[in-house]
Each structure stands twice: as C-alpha cells, then as structure tokens.
Amino acid sequence: MLSPPDIADAITAGLRARAAQDDLEQSVYGFDSLAEVKLHPLVHSALRDAGLGVFPEQRYPSDWINPKRSEGLRCDVVITDDAKGVALRDPRTRGTLFDTLDAVDPEDAYWLEIKTVSQYTTRGPFKGYSKELLSPVADDVKKLWADSLIFHSGLLLILFTETRDVAEHDLLAWFDRCLKRGYPVASPSARGFEISNRIGNGWCAVAVFGVRGV
C-alpha cells in the first residue's frame, strides 16, 4: 500500500526535474509562478514517472450514488500502486456483469487532495498567503475524513517560500492548527529543495499529511 513518504518522494523527484528544466531553459518565470490548477499536471506526471496509477478529478465514493456524473465533490487525484490499473471500481457494480476486472477498489486506492500556496507571485508578495494556507486547506482534510469508503488518503501541501526556515515554520503552524481543531492528520512526510529565486521564492516544500488511519 502506498504511504505518504512514497508519494512525497515521487512528487519531489518530479518537481526537482521541472526546476532543473526551468534553469536549463533560462525561463523568465519558474514553475512556482504557475496557478494551482496548472501545477496539478506536474504532480500527475511525477507520480506516473514513479510507476503509479493516476486518476485525476475523481468523484468521492459517497457521491457515486448521484446519477449525474457531472455533480458531486471531486478529489484532486486518486493514486494506485499499479500503473496498469484501468479505472476505479464503482462499488455499485462490484461482482456484477458490469464490473471491470482490472479496476481498483476505492478502499485500496490513495485519495490525495492538492494545495499549493506561494509566498510570492509574479505581482510581488502574496498578501493572502497566511489566510490561504490556514483556511481552505483544512476544508480538504474534512472532505477526506468524512467519506466512509476512503481508507487511505492524504493532503499534499506544496509551499513556495523565500527560505527553507519559512517553509518549515509554516508547515508546523498548519499541522499544529489541525491538531488543535481535532483533525485526524498525521505528522507530515516533508521534503524540500532550493529553486532559483525569480520572483521571491527560493524554496519548494513538499509535504504529504496522512488523513485516515493515523
């Protein structure tokens, strides 16, 4: 079964490679300038390069009973330890003629929400940095926690900060806040590396917080 350290290592390796590519191409802006939604494909590629199955934007299992597939809460990415997996298994079709042989049960997959926050943007210091870090992120934890069909899940928090010290301090502050609110969040599997400072960010922190089974 996949673990937060496995996922953190895979994503860090992929983002390091992207940082090196930005430097080689002498890009005016690095990948830290990208909007969160545009960073998701980088995370997906990193996981695939590690030989993992990647299923972006999957509906939460508790919402599968909704006949309208376009509706319901969605998880940023669902990960399996087999890149050959063709799909996630719908519990409603398990054991029926409509079941998919190579599908992965939702209970066996790793459900990951992604959040990225940058201390600096192309417009300068991000004034909403602290609020963005401490408020919406906790909402993702609650979504994972609330679904009874999710056994393995976590939150990926990618921080772009001026220094390593800032990142480590802010990750600890976020974790401490979750504990004080009673969220079932485990200590993070945290990684980090220097990035070329183009807009004010000199450090990329990658942290995966396990949410269930802690």
Predicted feature descriptions by range:
Residues 48-92:
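A short acidic/basic microdomain associated with nuclease active sites
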Residues 88-109:
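A recognition module on extended beta-rich or small alphabeta surfaces enriched in W/G with H and D/E
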Residues 160-214:
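Non-catalytic C-terminal interaction segments of nucleic acid-processing enzymes
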Residues 118-183:
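Acidic, metal/cofactor-coordinating or nucleic-acid-engaging core segments within structured domains
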Residues 62-66, 94-101, 129, 140-145:
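Short secondary-structure capping micro-motifs at structural edges
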Residues 77-83, 106-124:
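Conserved catalytic cores of phosphodiester-cleaving nucleases, focusing on short active-site segments
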Residues 1-19, 106, 128-150:
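An N-terminal amphipathic alpha-helical segment
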